A protein has these predicted regions:
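Extreme N-terminal basic, low-complexity initiation segments
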Residues: 2-8
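Extended beta-strand/beta-hairpin segments
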Residues: 6, 18-71, 81-166
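Alpha-helical metal-binding/catalytic segments enriched in His/Glu/Asp
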Residues: 76-77
C-alpha cells in the first residue's frame, strides 16, 4: 500500500494529545528582520522581543534565545520554590536568583553550562531547607534541559547570623 492510498484513512483518525501532555500554551512569534523576533504570549497578550547576541552576528539589544533558556531556568526554580513556600506559609519576599550562561566553544553552538546563585532570605538551618532545594532541582525547565548542560546551583541562605553557601 502506498502512502497516497493510506492518506484518506489516516486523516479520519482524530488528532489526540499525547497522554503526558497536560496543558498547552500558545505563543505566536514573528521574525521582524535584522535578527529580531517578537513573541506574543496568547493567554496574557504580553510581548517579548529577542535579538541575536553580539557574538553571533546580532546587536545584543534584547534577550537572545539562549538567554531566555537561562532566564526560564532561573524563573522556573524561583517559581517552584515559591509554590512550595506558599504551601508551607514561608515568606520568601526578597528571594533572588542570578544566572550565568556559558556557550560551548566547539560546534554545534549550544549552552554548555548554567550557573545559578540562589539567594534565599531564610537561615541555613531552616527546617524546610532540603524541601526548597529539592523543589528547585525538580522544576520543569530543569527536567527539560539536555543532560549535557552542566547546571550548578550555589545556595546562599541569608536569614540569620549563620549565613552559609551551599
Amino acid at each position: 500500500m502506498d502512502s497516497a492510498s493510506c492518506l484518506p484513512k489516516c486523516r479520519q483518525k482524530p488528532i489526540e494529545s499525547p497522554p503526558h501532555s497536560v496543558t498547552m500554551v500558545e505563543i505566536n512569534l514573528s521574525y521582524e528582520g535584522d535578527l529580531h523576533c517578537s513573541a506574543v504570549h496568547i493567554p496574557s497578550g504580553n510581548i517579548l522581543v529577542t535579538d541575536a547576541p553580539v557574538d553571533n552576528n546580532g546587536r545584543g539589544q534584547a534577550f537572545s534565545p539562549t538567554d531566555l533558556v537561562a532566564t526560564a531556568l532561573a524563573s522556573c526554580m524561583a517559581t517552584v520554590i515559591g509554590i512550595v513556600a506558599r504551601r508551607k506559609d514561608i515568606d520568601l519576599a526578597g528571594m533572588k536568583v542570578n544566572v550565568r550562561k556559558f556557550m560551548s566553544e566547539d560546534q554545534p553552538r549550544r549552552i554548555s553550562r548554567l550557573e545559578l546563585d540562589l539567594d534565599i532570605p531564610l537561615p541555613a538551618h531552616h527546617p524546610e531547607r532540603k524541601l526548597l532545594e529539592s523543589a528547585a532541582r525538580g522544576c520543569p525547565v530543569h527536567h527539560s534541559l539536555h543532560p549535557d548542560i552542566d547546571v550548578k546551583m550555589n545556595w546562599n541562605w541569608r536569614g540569620g547570623p549563620d549565613q552559609i553557601a551551599g
